[in-house]
Regions:
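Non-globular, low-confidence helical/coil segments that flank catalytic cores
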Residues: 1-241
């Protein structure tokens, strides 16, 4: 949120695993948690909703959000649409909401969010929108579920160093957050979005070890983590889960 303009990256959403394996991708929970949180911090409209990619845990609440909240436009990642994304696009068409795919940058009151989209990959995770944002000399990097291959490609193409806040890729899975990548970007703070006692064992110990020189915040332990820039200072607030 900046000067009455608000951008949301991903909505969250919980996948249900209470059915046969072949049905798992078609069942998910919809809640109002995203809308409740946005209203609690004074946001009543989104200028842009960005989905990093089409997994339920990243955009499972998107349709509910669009149907019950004011959203001006939606940005999708590179690659082909899955069923969840296609359903959302149909809703956007009905509501005459603009949507864009595989963009390079987005303006926020004179500041730019850069989308580090190298190429189209053959897997959804590496097709994640990776977003770099710099404001008042503070650097933010949001990795979606991008894996080690894309991390390497990003380092080879972009001059990234001394990142202030890293949104760690793929919830702390060992398919992301390589030592090579972390040594290059040297994040001061690292945020891991992860559920308590999750079935995948995220974050992995190897990833936590790779991030040993970074200040790590985890949503399963720290709850909601908020970064605010005030008078050229970066403030951190947490709300226990």
């Amino acid at each position: 949120k900046y000067k009455n303009e608000a951008i949301l990256i991903d909505t969250g959403g919980k996948v249900s695993f209470k059915t046969e394996k072949w049905k798992q991708k078609t069942k998910y929970y919809i809640t109002d948690s995203t809308i409740v949180f946005l209203k609690s911090i004074g946001i009543t409209k989104l200028n842009t909703l960005i989905t990093t990619h089409g997994d339920y845990d990243h955009m499972g609440e998107a349709s509910n959000l669009i149907n019950n909240f004011k959203v001006d436009k939606v940005v999708f990642n590179c690659g082909t649409y899955n069923d969840l994304e296609s359903n959302l696009i149909n809703i956007l068409k009905v509501k005459n909401i603009d949507n864009y795919t595989c963009i390079k940058e987005l303006s926020l009151k004179g500041h730019k969010l850069n989308f580090l989209n190298i190429k189209e990959y053959d897997n959804e995770n590496d097709n994640s929108n990776v977003i770099y944002f710099k404001y008042n000399n503070f650097k933010f990097l949001f990795m979606g579920d991008a894996g080690i291959t894309k991390e390497k490609n990003i380092i080879e193409k972009y001059n990234l160093s001394n990142i202030d806040v890293l949104k760690v890729g793929h919830h702390g899975s060992d398919t992301s957050t390589s030592e090579y990548f972390i040594n290059k970007i040297n994040p001061k703070y690292s945020i891991i979005s992860v559920g308590k006692n999750n079935r995948y064992g995220h974050p992995k110990e190897s990833v936590l070890n790779t991030l040993k020189n970074s200040n790590v915040y985890r949503t399963d332990k720290n709850g909601t983590v908020m970064f605010k820039i005030k008078k050229d200072k970066l403030q951190i607030e947490t709300c226990s889960p």
